[in-house]
């Protein structure tokens, strides 16, 4: 009789263990599937957009799923193209947008060390180099993807503070005029900022 009760108890215990183990496994699998879905969704959103910056044309091209949807005039560096820190040159190669800065900041307001200064700058529409380098409206901070070329050591685009940003020298857009960054018209940089997510790739080429 005792032996039979033990068998019943052991069977019941085994059933309960299997039941709880099964539920735990199901919950774990569901969480894993959800995590994979979120990762793939994020990748899909980011991969949908890509940016090409042509130095020779002084234009930025925005693609969605390999289809051109926007084209903007820009200004790259007045000092030419190069990767080395303190050169003031525009780096070439593949980058990604590491950080977007300036959401809800008023148009023509400017930044100092990426901190918003709630004050509008005077926009220069003539082809005049004021020797100032106001960063206005929005910032998209670039991070190099080519190790040893535009990432790491003394050729790191992110540590060089290379941005896509608005400028007060709008009259010089379309010409090489920046100190290394990619400058845009303020209304253009506002639009681009809203269209693309962080992690969007940016290819800068001659």
What are these regions (language model features)?
Residues 30-36:
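Sec-dependent signal peptide recognition
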Residues 42-44:
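N-terminal signal peptide c-region/cleavage motif recognized by signal peptidases
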Residues 48, 55-57, 69, 92, ...:
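Extracytoplasmic
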Residues 69-107:
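Electropositive
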Residues 47-80:
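A structural motif detector for short, solvent-exposed N-terminal "entry" segments of globular domains
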Residues 5:
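Cationic, low-complexity basic patches in intrinsically disordered or flexible, solvent-exposed regions
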Residues 88, 105-206:
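Exported/periplasmic cell-wall-interacting domains
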């Amino acid at each position: 009789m005792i032996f039979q009760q033990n068998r019943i108890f052991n069977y019941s215990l085994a059933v309960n263990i299997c039941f709880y183990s099964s539920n735990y496994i199901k919950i774990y699998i569901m969480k894993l599937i959800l995590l994979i879905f979120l990762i793939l969704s994020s990748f899909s959103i980011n991969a949908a957009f890509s940016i090409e910056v042509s130095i020779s044309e002084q234009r930025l091209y925005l693609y969605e799923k390999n289809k051109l949807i926007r084209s903007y005039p820009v200004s790259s560096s007045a000092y030419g193209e190069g990767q080395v820190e303190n050169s003031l040159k525009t780096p070439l190669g593949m980058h990604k947008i590491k950080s977007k800065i300036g959401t809800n900041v008023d148009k023509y307001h400017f930044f100092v060390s990426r901190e918003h200064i709630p004050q509008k700058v005077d926009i220069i529409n003539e082809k005049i180099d004021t020797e100032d380098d106001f960063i206005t409206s929005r910032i998209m901070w670039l991070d190099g993807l080519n190790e040893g070329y535009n990432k790491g050591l003394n050729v790191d685009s992110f540590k060089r503070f290379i941005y896509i940003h608005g400028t007060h020298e709008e009259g010089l857009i379309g010409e090489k005029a920046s100190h290394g960054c990619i400058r845009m018209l303020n209304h253009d940089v506002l639009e681009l900022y809203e269209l693309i997510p962080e992690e969007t790739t940016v290819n800068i080429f001659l």
